[in-house]
């Protein structure tokens, strides 16, 4: 087994705002082999959430975020980090859609194409990713080169059946990294006609089930939960 050492680098990217709540965060994980010769493998995890179709920066006259944010700027930042780091995992926690005319006119095509160009590894779905309905989301998937991981949404009775994953395992520098994705309760938050027959399952039960599966069956060295639940959550 290997020892996991976590190094938080929030100071490097304290407040890189994409939208009203979106943030690119960076963390580094160092795996140290328990042998006489201590070989260190560094994994860098980049994470975004709530991008809400903000392709361009805010207006330079904006009182709160002058000339800040936007997927174009974040793409440049990601490229800068890729030049310095070798083993990168780029993830998104949902609410990619809704918030600017880009979504109203192009229905998600622009967002998915940009994220594909940025080489995202995976994303989960937020409530606003249902804003064009299940069929609308499915129609945009050909523009995404990355998978959507939805561990607690059951799409078996919808057109999204077999178009998302429950988890995904990534291999980085000889390490197995398991990623699962958790979504929010849709009932009462999203109109029923938009999510259709999607079955919502308890996020805590699903997260623990897949974490156990990834750890014990698939022998992952690290497990990451990409969650759209926020810091404090209850669906009761």
Range-by-range predicted roles:
Residues 2-236:
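Acidic, metal/ion-coordinating pockets
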């Amino acid at each position: 087994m290997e020892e996991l050492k976590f190094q938080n680098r929030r100071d490097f990217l304290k407040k890189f705002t994409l939208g009203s709540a979106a943030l690119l965060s960076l963390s580094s994980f160092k795996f140290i082999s328990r042998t006489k010769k201590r070989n260190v493998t560094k994994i860098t995890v980049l994470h975004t959430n709530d991008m809400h179709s903000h392709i361009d920066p805010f207006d330079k006259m904006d009182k709160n975020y002058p000339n800040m944010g936007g997927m174009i700027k974040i793409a440049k930042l990601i490229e800068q980090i890729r030049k310095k780091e070798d083993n990168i995992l780029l993830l998104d926690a949902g609410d990619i859609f809704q918030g600017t005319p880009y979504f109203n006119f192009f229905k998600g095509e622009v967002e998915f194409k940009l994220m594909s160009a940025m080489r995202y590894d995976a994303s989960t779905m937020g409530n606003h990713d249902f804003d064009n309905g299940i069929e609308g989301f499915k129609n945009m998937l050909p523009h995404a080169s990355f998978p959507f991981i939805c561990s607690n949404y059951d799409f078996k009775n919808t057109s999204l059946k077999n178009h998302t994953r429950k988890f995904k395992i990534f291999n980085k520098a000889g390490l197995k990294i398991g990623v699962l994705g958790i979504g929010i309760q849709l009932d009462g938050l999203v109109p029923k006609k938009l999510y259709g027959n999607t079955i919502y399952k308890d996020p805590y039960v699903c997260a623990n089930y897949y974490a156990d599966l990834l750890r014990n069956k698939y022998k992952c060295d690290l497990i990451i939960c990409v969650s759209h639940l926020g810091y404090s959550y209850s669906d009761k």
